[in-house]
Amino acid sequence: MESHSKPSPYAKLPDILLLFSQMLTTGVYSTFFLTTYLTFEDAIFQQRLNFYYHSLTYIFLTGIIFFGLALFYQYRNSPETKDDAEEEPPKKSKSSRLYLYFLAGLLIQIILYFLVAGFELLNFFIFLLAASSILGIARTFSVKSKYDSWNHPTTAGGIIEGTISLGTIAGLWAFAGTDLSRVFAWIILIILVFEILTLWARFRYLSRWSYLTQETLQMLLGSHIALFGVRFIFGLIMPLVYIVWVLFISNLSLLPIILMIFVGELSERILFFIAAIDQTQITYKSNENISENIGGEQE
């Protein structure tokens, strides 16, 4: 039957790209927005405001590139991706529309800035769209999903924490060498601790809730152990140890943790989708095993 056919290798890629795009762009925008508008010295505020407006173009282009890649892979193998898309949870609704409104708001502000001047009130509206978009997508994945492995508060927590991490490393890069560097380092340190605790809570849930979640856990620690190792060791433990070393022992550059956290968050999004299984996939796996057994008996 078609419903039990092997899924396309590209089936999950559009969702990975779209979710990572939302986390990256909204996180970076929110960081630059808060860094700018929580500055109370006039000279520094004006300097950061100019940087904020110039960064909008890059944030917008990043969102468009990821969104375009998601559409490309969505239609690359249209029969397979269409079938898989119909089985996905209804996440392409309000939260996705808010994300498109967020990108549209960025475009309008970019045009206004180059033609006349930035419209200050629009910045606050865009920030609300960014926050609403990521909170909405986090809630949708953790509440309205058909995957047992997603229906847990740790799903929303992981998405929100990942968004903050991506935004904070962007701030660490943009304001390297300033007084904000250590502020961002402390924020990243706190978020990394929360992410480790979230991962621990998620593993407890996966190991106890149902057969499907136990299968997901076996996939994470079995066929996807290399990618999980990248996520856990390179994306969590190494930056945590490095930040503690820099903050308390040595005065090294904080920039190396940018790559660690970026790769770690990307690998987390990949694992989030490819390790999620439902009854359909279990049925396909069972049918495949039965076919292999029958073939072996005939031999």
Range-by-range predicted roles:
Residues 10-15, 47-48, 54-57, 151-152:
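Alpha-helix initiation/capping motif
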Residues 3-10, 16, 140-143, 153, ...:
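A near-ubiquitous, low-amplitude feature marking generic local secondary-structure context
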Residues 1-2, 21-39, 53-85, 102-114:
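Transmembrane-helix bundle segments that line or gate the permeation/cavity pathway
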Residues 1-23, 81-93, 210-227, 272-299:
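Extramembrane terminal tails and long inter-domain/linker segments of multi-pass membrane proteins
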Residues 38-45, 71-81, 146-147, 198-208, ...:
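Juxtamembrane/interface segments at transmembrane-helix termini
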Residues 24, 43-51, 86-251, 257-267:
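Long, contiguous internal "core" modules enriched in hydrophobic/ aromatic residues
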Residues 10-13, 17-20, 25-38, 70, ...:
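A broadly tuned "polar low-complexity/structure-edge" signature
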Residues 9, 16, 20, 61-62, ...:
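Generic secretory/membrane-interface signal
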